[in-house]
Structure formats: structure tokens, C-alpha cells
A protein has these predicted regions:
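Well-ordered, non-membrane alpha-helical segments in soluble/globular domains
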Residues: 64-79, 105-126
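Broad, structure-driven detector of short, well-ordered beta-strand segments within folded domains
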Residues: 177-184, 282-294, 348-350, 368-390
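Beta-strand-rich recognition/accessory modules
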Residues: 62-77, 87-94, 272-276, 322, ...
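Acidic (Asp/Glu-rich), glycine- and aromatic
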Residues: 192-196, 275, 282-286, 294-344
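Active-site-adjacent pocket scaffolds in enzyme catalytic domains
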Residues: 1-82
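Acidic-aromatic substrate-binding/catalytic surfaces of carbohydrate-active enzymes
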Residues: 179-278
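Surface beta-strand/loop "capping" patches
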Residues: 145-182
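Aromatic- and carboxylate-enriched substrate-binding clefts and catalytic-loop regions
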Residues: 1-35, 89-100, 107-109, 130-156
């Protein structure tokens, strides 16, 4: 649940970046390795990093020629992240000498281990000679990082699959208030969300509640909480939208697409390619735009109807977030959570009791969940006219909470 690239840890929780000088712990932290932001998310983190032995352990090499182009492609994709971070990209190989011994400790022969190390270092060395890489000590880098980055400047990565031959794309965003992952294979759904805003005090070690678990809790985590596809009890944790027409329903999680990154002032923008949604008697071309305004602690999601086969048709749009909290695949106690709807001064609340209840409010200004266990509130609002806000509690077999808005949308309209 922490950053994938260097950050300034906050005093209260080292996984959450500091938002200002008062929260600054005084150090610059670096990740142990630079890992594949798709393969390590979907699979084993020890197989896909810029440590040659990781790549060998993942068996991502030619057994006859002992070549491993994936290692170089991984380094190059990290180099490309400068496009999303104001000209800055970071990469490292951090390993001890133990894996170069001849004691049979590793999965591959010593000769291959030695060759992979030398080849990896040579690749960095050649980049340096070409003027494409600057090598620094950790102390030098800490000074560079503080000079280069502001506290609230986010780290961004539009990452694509370079291993399995798919077109899958993820976008990662990290700042002092949240870490989010947008999955283009699921129509731009948010599939991982960590609410750093609380800078949660989370003691770890012997004599604490968390002997070994230092993870920052999630609100959404598709691997541990099933994501879009789960059992018959409904969605796992995900932030997505459904379109409904004449009794048919399509979730954007089923609409694969691609994204393009841009920046306007202090806002990072993800523009997704339009998707076609086919109902029995209607086809809708819809585009999604996801915006992250620096320092706002908010994510803006716009849906644009570009075209309809029947220009006079109207479809229902259900924007929703299914969330919970935790650090593992095992559910936590949801008692104590409060769900609410707000319209002007009218606030209606529902205390979570696993009773599968629902509550809605026409023209709601906001729907909200307060999760005291992780000192976090998550809310949703919309600019859609006549939208109905709703909240739902789950039950023991599906211990989630849902916030959402139902509205109508027509051809050429935009809802955010």
C-alpha cells in the first residue's frame, strides 16, 4: 500500500507521503527495487523487478542464449515515466552480493547469475555514456529529490504490459492524500485506492496490534476484495459505472479501452478512448475522462455521450463505489461505519449493522461513508440534474458499503 517510487515519508505513517514541512520526517525514502507496475500488481512481486535475479526467478529469459530483453524493457519503461512527472524518472537496482556466491543458493547456475548482473550493470553504464542516465548516491539523490519535487506534486505512471503480449494498461497516481490505480482493461475503473489523507497511526512490531502487517489500508482492492467480478452477492470493491436501458445493464468494467495522459496546470488528466456499449435496440458511444487535481484529495470522473444510434434516447447512469477497509483478503469488522445522504441541511444517516439496508435521497448534494477504524471519510457528489444519491450497507457474506448516484443521460451530454 505504499508508493512505488521515492517519496518523503510523513512522521506519523511512513507509507504515506508528507503533505507539508510539518509532516516531513526528514528523510527521502526509496523503494527496495523498481518493479513492474502491472506484473507485480497482478502476480508475484519477486519475479518482475529491476534486479536481474528477479527476472531469472520469473524464468523470463531464453534458456539457450541466456538473454533477457524483458529486463532492459523494464528499465526503459521506467525511463519513459519522465513523460508523466515533469521530466523526472527514477530507476534502481538494489541487491546484496550474496546472490553471486557459488553455494547453490539460487535457482540458476552461478555463471548465469554473474552474467545477468554484469549485463544489467553494462546496460546502465551504456545509458550513462550516452548521456541518458545520471547515477547518484542515495544522499545525492535525496538532495536532488527535494530540489526537484514539491510536497504535493504527485507521482504518476501510465504503465503497459511488456511481458505477456496483452494490451493491458494501468494508471497509477500517488500524492500525500491517496494512492489510486485506474484499470483501462476495466473501462477506467478504480481498482485500488489507499486513503493517505488520514496519515493513519499504525504501530507495527512486537507488542502492537500489527506484529508484521505494515500495509496502508485500502478502500478498494480488487485482488483482495474481488473487484468487479465476484460471487452472486454483487460487486467486490471497485469504482465504476453502469448504464441501463430497457431492462438491460452494462458495467463499464466490461469495456476495455486505452488511456492518454495530459497535464493542465496542476491537474493530471487521463483521457480514455471511447467505448461502444450495445443494447438490444441502442448503441451508445461513451468517453471517460479521469482528472486528479493536485492537493485536492479528489478524483473527478466525467462521462461524455459522444453518439447514440437513437439521438432521442435516454439511458440511466449509475455511478458507484463499492468499498470497505483492510489490508488482507479477510474482511474486517464494519460495525461503527456510518453512511449518510445530504441535501442542504437535511442529513440522513445509517449505522452499519450488516442488514443489507439501503437509503436514497433525490437531488442529494453528497453521499458519504465515515470509517472511523481508519480515520477516513469517502464521499461522492455529482453535477447531474435530478440525480438520486444512495447508500447501501452489505451483509456478512458481502461485507461492503456502496455509495452512488442514479441519473439520466442523453446524447451529447456530459455528467461528472
Amino acid at each position: 500500500g505504499g508508493p512505488w517510487a521515492p517519496w518523503i515519508p510523513s512522521k506519523q505513517n511512513t507509507h504515506a507521503p508528507a503533505a507539508n514541512e510539518a509532516e516531513d520526517s526528514g528523510v527521502v525514502a526509496i523503494p527496495h527495487l523498481s518493479r513492474d507496475l502491472l506484473a507485480c500488481y497482478d502476480g508475484n512481486g519477486s519475479n518482475f523487478g529491476t534486479h536481474p535475479q528477479n527476472v531469472l526467478r520469473g524464468m523470463i529469459y531464453d534458456t539457450k542464449t541466456w538473454e533477457y530483453p524483458y529486463l532492459y524493457n523494464l528499465i526503459d519503461q521506467y525511463r519513459s515515466l519522465e513523460k508523466y512527472n515533469n521530466g523526472y524518472a527514477y530507476n534502481m537496482m538494489f541487491v546484496g552480493p550474496g546472490w553471486l556466491n557459488k553455494m547453490g543458493r539460487w535457482e540458476q547456475p552461478y555463471e548465469l547469475l554473474k552474467k545477468s548482473y554484469e549485463d544489467g550493470m553494462k546496460y546502465y553504464g551504456d545509458l550513462k555514456k550516452e548521456g541518458k542516465l545520471t547515477d547518484m548516491t542515495m544522499a545525492e539523490f535525496a538532495d536532488y529529490y527535494r530540489q526537484k519535487k514539491t510536497y504535493t506534486e504527485p507521482e504518476c505512471a501510465l504503465w503497459r504490459d511488456i511481458l505477456y503480449g496483452s494490451d493491458k494498461q494501468l494508471f497509477w497516481y500517488c500524492d500525500p492524500f491517496m494512492r489510486a490505480c485506474v484499470n483501462m482493461d476495466q473501462g477506467g475503473a478504480i481498482v485500488d485506492l489507499r486513503p493517505y489523507a488520514a496519515k493513519l497511526e499504525w504501530p507495527v512490531g512486537i507488542g502492537t496490534k500489527h506484529v508484521t502487517d505494515a500495509s496502508y489500508p485500502f478502500l478498494i482492492q480488487e485482488k483482495y476484495r474481488a473487484g468487479y467480478f465476484t460471487h452472486y452477492a454483487g460487486e467486490g470493491t471497485v469504482r465504476s459505472a453502469k448504464l441501463k436501458h430497457n431492462g438491460e445493464e452494462v458495467d463499464l468494467c466490461l469495456c476495455r479501452t486505452k488511456a492518454h495522459f495530459s497535464q493542465e496546470g496542476s491537474t493530471r488528466i487521463l483521457t480514455l478512448d471511447p467505448v461502444d456499449i450495445e443494447f438490444y435496440d441502442l448503441t451508445v458511444k461513451l468517453q471517460t475522462i479521469v482528472s486528479f487535481e493536485e492537493g485536492s484529495s479528489a478524483i473527478k470522473i466525467e462521462r461524455k455521450i459522444l453518439e447514440m444510434s437513437d439521438p432521442n434516447a435516454e439511458v440511466e447512469l449509475n455511478e458507484y463505489i463499492v468499498a470497505c477497509y483492510g489490508t488482507t483478503e479477510y474482511s474486517e469488522d464494519m460495525m461503527g461505519i456510518t453512511l449518510s445522504t445530504k441535501k442542504g441541511d437535511e442529513v440522513e444517516t445509517l449505522d452499519y449493522e450488516y442488514k443489507c439496508r439501503e437509503m436514497e435521497k433525490a437531488d442529494a448534494d453528497e453521499v458519504r461513508a465515515v470509517i472511523p477504524q481508519i480515520e477516513t471519510a469517502v464521499s461522492m457528489s455529482t453535477n447531474a440534474e435530478g440525480a438520486v444519491g444512495y447508500v447501501k450497507e452489505g451483509y456478512a457474506f458481502s461485507p461492503m458499503l456502496t455509495l452512488g448516484y442514479n441519473s439520466k443521460i442523453k446524447d451529447k451530454e456530459v455528467v461528472a
